[in-house]
């Protein structure tokens, strides 16, 4: 059974690497939001549960990688897969020790929990995959409904 599972994972990873990686889209307003935040002097970082190599490829494919000072993600050898571990890795890699200097923006429960585990405030975005109930239940500090709402909140 374990051998079949490993075969399945290998088939999925091969498909994902070949074409599945790009089977998504950028939400409307995201590029304008990133541009606006960067112009306002925000240092933008990525902490994703996707494999780091895949995250870089996706952001480059959609022309968004230039907005980010650092792109961090999970490892392919499973040594860093938990969201809290990825966030910690990004914070350490970027020399962020003062947690008040950073805020996590996410759309799922694991984003909120991983950020809280690292002492960060969290903005839950309602234009992603998670629901209001999921984000509130996980303990998000703020909720926004649009990329423009995120800019407004962060620039206060």
Where are these regions (language model features)?
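Short beta->alpha linker loops
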Residues: 25-29, 50, 107, 127-130, ...
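Substrate-recognition element of Asp-dependent hydrolases with the DxDx(T/V) motif
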Residues: 33-59
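Conserved Lys-Pro-Asp/Glu-containing loop-to-beta segment of HAD-superfamily phosphomonoesterases
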Residues: 83-113
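Conserved H-loop
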Residues: 22, 65-69, 97
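Metal-dependent phosphoesterase signature
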Residues: 1-32, 40-42, 100
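A short, structured active-site edge motif that brings together acidic residues
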Residues: 65-80
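Surface-exposed amphipathic alpha-helices with a cationic face
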Residues: 31-39, 91, 112-117
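Acidic, Mg2+-coordinating phosphoryl-transfer loop and its flanking beta/alpha structural elements
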Residues: 103-145
């Amino acid at each position: 059974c374990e051998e079949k599972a490993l075969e399945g994972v290998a088939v999925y990873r091969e498909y994902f690497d070949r074409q599945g990686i790009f089977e998504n889209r950028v939400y409307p307003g995201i590029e304008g939001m990133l541009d606006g935040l960067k112009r306002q002097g925000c240092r933008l970082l990525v902490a994703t549960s996707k494999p780091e190599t895949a995250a870089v490829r996706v952001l480059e494919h959609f022309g968004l990688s230039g907005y980010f000072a650092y792109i961090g993600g999970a490892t392919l050898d499973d040594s860093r897969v938990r969201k809290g571990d990825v966030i910690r890795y990004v914070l350490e890699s970027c020399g962020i020790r003062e947690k008040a200097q950073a805020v996590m923006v996410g759309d799922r429960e694991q984003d909120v929990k991983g950020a809280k585990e690292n002492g960060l405030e969290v903005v839950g975005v309602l234009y992603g995959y998670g629901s209001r109930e999921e984000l509130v239940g996980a303990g998000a500090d703020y909720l926004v409904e649009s990329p423009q709402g995120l800019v407004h909140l962060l620039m206060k």
